[in-house]
C-alpha cells in the first residue's frame, strides 16, 4: 500500500480525516473506515485530489450523499473524497441551472421551487446527490435526469477538465457513459422551463406523499436495490416469491415495499450482500428472472 502523506498541503479549504468511520456517511448506516477521508468544499480541491491520487497510484473513491451504495465492512483503502459540501448552485440566463455535484436533489428541488422552474419535480424525494443522480441517470415517477441535463463537466483520471453534452453522456436506464469512463462529475447544467410556484409545489407534495405512503422511510436503507427487469417490476417479483420480511442478520426485505432492503438491527454490509444474493437466487428459481443490482458496493 502506498503511504498517503502531505495530502493536507494540496487542499485549501477541505477537511482531511484519517481512519474515519464511513457508516456516518451512508444511508444504510453500514461500512468500515476510510483510510483517508477528504470532505471537499470546492472544485479546485477536487481537481488537486484527483491529480494527487493519479500521480501517486492511490485508489480514489468518490462518495456523494451515500444513498445508493453499500460500503464494505472492511472500509475503503486509499482516499475517499466526499462531495456533499460541494453544493453551490446558481441560475444562469435562459433558465439554466448550474450546480456542483455534491448538491442534494432535495436542495435542487427547493431551488427550482424558489425560482419557479419546472421539470425536475420527479427527483424531489430521491435521496441522492446531483453527481450520483447523473452517474446513474436516476429517475422516478416517469422522469429521468437525461430529460433535463444540458451538459456535464467532469475531471478525467489525470485531473483534466472535460465537458459532455447530453447526447455524449449516452444516457439509458440507470446508465451514463461515466460508468465506463470512470471520470468524476464536478458540475452539471440543467435546462429548465418556467412554471408556476403553486403547480410545482403541488406536484412535489403529491410525489412526496406517494413516496412516504409506499416506501419504508422510517428505516435506514440504500433505496431501490435492483434495476427494473424488462417487462417486470423487481419489487413485484420479490413479493410474489414470498420474500417480504426475509431477514439476514440485521438486514431485511422491507415489509412495506419489497424493492427495498432496510437496516432493522445494526446490519452489516455483509448482511446486505448475503440478503441480496438470497433474493436473487429465490426470484430466479420462482420466476426465471435474474435481478441486477442497482446499488453499488464500495470497498473490498
Walk through the language-model features, giving the residues of each.
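Short, well-ordered alpha-helical segments in soluble proteins
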Residues: 112, 130, 134-138, 153-156, ...
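Structural signature of FAD isoalloxazine-binding scaffolds in flavoprotein oxidoreductases
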Residues: 31-32, 37-43, 70-88, 135-166, ...
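A gly/ser-rich beta-alpha-beta helix-loop segment of oxidoreductase catalytic cores
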Residues: 113-150, 221
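Short acidic (Asp/Glu) patches
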Residues: 106, 136-138, 167-173
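Phosphate/pyrophosphate- and phosphate-bearing ligand-binding catalytic cores of soluble enzymes
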Residues: 17-18, 155-157, 161-274, 278-282, ...
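Short, basic and Ser/Thr-rich N-terminal targeting/leader segments
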Residues: 56, 63-65, 148, 219-220, ...
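Anion-binding (especially nucleotide phosphate/pyrophosphate-binding) glycine-rich loop
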Residues: 2-130
Amino acid at each position: 500500500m502506498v503511504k498517503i502523506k502531505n495530502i493536507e498541503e494540496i487542499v485549501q479549504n477541505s477537511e482531511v480525516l484519517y481512519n474515519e468511520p464511513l457508516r456516518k456517511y451512508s444511508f444504510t448506516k453500514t461500512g468500515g473506515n476510510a483510510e483517508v477521508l477528504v470532505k471537499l468544499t470546492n472544485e479546485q480541491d477536487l481537481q488537486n485530489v484527483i491529480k494527487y491520487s493519479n500521480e501517486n497510484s492511490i485508489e480514489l473513491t468518490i462518495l456523494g450523499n451515500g444513498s445508493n451504495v453499500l460500503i464494505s465492512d472492511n472500509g475503503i483503502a486509499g482516499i475517499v473524497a466526499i462531495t456533499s459540501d460541494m453544493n453551490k448552485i446558481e441560475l444562469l440566463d435562459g433558465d439554466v441551472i448550474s450546480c456542483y455535484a455534491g448538491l442534494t436533489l432535495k436542495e435542487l428541488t427547493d431551488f427550482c421551487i424558489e425560482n419557479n422552474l419546472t421539470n425536475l419535480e420527479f427527483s424531489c424525494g430521491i435521496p441522492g446527490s446531483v453527481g450520483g443522480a447523473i452517474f446513474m441517470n436516476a429517475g422516478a415517477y416517469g422522469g429521468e435526469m437525461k430529460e433535463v441535463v444540458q451538459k456535464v463537466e467532469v475531471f478525467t483520471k489525470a485531473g483534466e477538465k472535460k465537458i459532455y453534452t447530453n447526447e455524449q453522456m449516452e444516457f439509458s436506464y440507470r446508465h451514463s457513459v461515466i460508468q465506463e469512463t470512470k471520470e468524476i462529475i464536478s458540475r452539471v447544467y440543467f435546462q429548465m422551463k418556467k412554471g408556476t410556484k403553486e403547480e410545482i409545489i403541488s406536484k412535489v407534495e403529491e410525489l412526496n406523499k406517494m413516496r412516504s405512503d409506499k416506501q419504508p422511510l422510517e428505516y435506514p436503507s440504500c433505496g431501490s436495490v435492483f434495476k427494473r427487469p424488462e417487462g417486470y417490476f423487481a419489487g413485484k417479483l420479490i413479493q410474489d416469491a414470498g420474500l417480504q420480511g426475509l431477514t439476514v442478520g440485521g438486514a431485511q426485505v422491507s415489509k412495506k415495499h419489497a424493492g427495498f432492503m432496510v437496516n432493522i438491527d445494526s446490519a452489516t454490509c455483509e448482511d446486505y450482500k448475503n440478503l441480496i444474493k438470497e433474493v436473487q437466487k429465490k426470484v430466479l428459481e420462482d420466476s426465471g428472472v435474474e435481478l441486477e443490482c442497482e446499488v453499488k458496493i464500495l470497498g473490498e
